[in-house]
């Protein structure tokens, strides 16, 4: 009997040791992520997405999603350092989620509890999202959008007509020599205001044209649309002669203040997102991350 108890004790000790080894599923810069945190996050994701039964492949995907969300969360908390997320920020975030889902205020956490989800896992995720929003907010102060970027974005939408002022250079003949000279001219065209007649008058003519983009012929419309002011096109052939277009100015027509503001906000958010992604990518790249849970 004494031997049997000893064997049971040995096996019990072995199981406890195994449990302690598997209680940590990952570490981020020596900060542990426990199995309980991992399990709670999986459960939370399942409940919030109304998922009940999983195939083995789906369970693996869910495990990857849960562990990666916890790793990102840990990195964000470490990035924030001593900066505390205030309780009223958390409460307002939860109320916002409840409003979007048409839930009474104060019911979301209780709903999670009723589904056997640890509310702390949800609150930690809320905190990490608030840290992320603070990062985005700080980035917004360093982002600027130029008029040129706004014009390019509006032009690319093909929803507005554009008034074009351009210089069109046309060779006097279609010889190889004329083609060579036109290429040489193209490389010297920098700004409309700097163009002198002596640059081209021996082998080409120049016509100053004002036109709406929509009124230009197919080939010219395509070429001009892609050109920015004071940028010369490549040499192209028209009716056995060679042409170059140098755009002097572009004026987008009939853009309202609201439309302009929409484009500015879109471009600003895009730049902020790109900067944020770079920060988050660098967080991961520089971190010492170890995953001990089978992926």
Swiss-Prot record:
Keywords: Signal. InterPro entries: OMP_Chaperone_SurA, Trigger_fact/SurA_dom_sf. Residues 1-19 form the signal peptide. It holds the Pfam family SurA_N_3. The keyword Signal applies. This is Uncharacterized protein RT0667.
């Amino acid at each position: 009997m004494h031997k049997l108890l000893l064997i049971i004790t040995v096996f019990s000790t072995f199981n406890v040791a195994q449990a302690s080894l598997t209680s940590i599923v990952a570490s981020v810069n020596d900060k542990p992520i426990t199995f309980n945190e991992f399990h709670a996050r999986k459960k939370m994701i399942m409940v919030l997405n109304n998922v009940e039964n999983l195939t083995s492949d789906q369970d693996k995907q869910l495990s990857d999603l849960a562990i990666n969300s916890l790793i990102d969360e840990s990195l964000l908390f470490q990035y924030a350092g001593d900066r505390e997320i205030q309780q009223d920020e958390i409460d307002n975030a939860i109320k916002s989620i409840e409003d979007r889902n048409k839930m009474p205020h104060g019911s979301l956490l209780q709903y999670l509890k009723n589904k056997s989800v640890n509310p702390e896992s949800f609150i930690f995720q809320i905190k990490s999202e608030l840290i992320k929003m603070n990062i985005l907010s700080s980035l917004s102060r360093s982002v600027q959008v130029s008029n040129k970027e706004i014009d390019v974005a509006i032009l690319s939408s093909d929803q507005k007509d554009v008034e074009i002022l351009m210089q069109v250079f046309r060779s006097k003949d279609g010889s190889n020599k004329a083609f060579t000279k036109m290429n040489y001219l193209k490389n010297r065209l920098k700004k409309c205001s700097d163009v002198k007649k002596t640059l081209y008058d021996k082998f080409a003519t120049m016509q100053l044209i004002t036109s709406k983009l929509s009124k230009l012929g197919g080939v010219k419309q395509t070429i001009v649309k892609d050109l920015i002011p004071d940028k010369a096109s490549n040499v192209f052939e028209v009716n056995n002669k060679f042409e170059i277009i140098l755009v002097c100015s572009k004026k987008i027509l009939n853009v309202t203040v609201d439309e302009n503001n929409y484009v500015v906000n879109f471009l600003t958010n895009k730049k902020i997102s790109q900067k944020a992604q770079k920060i988050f990518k660098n967080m991961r790249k520089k971190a010492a991350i170890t995953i001990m849970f089978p992926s």
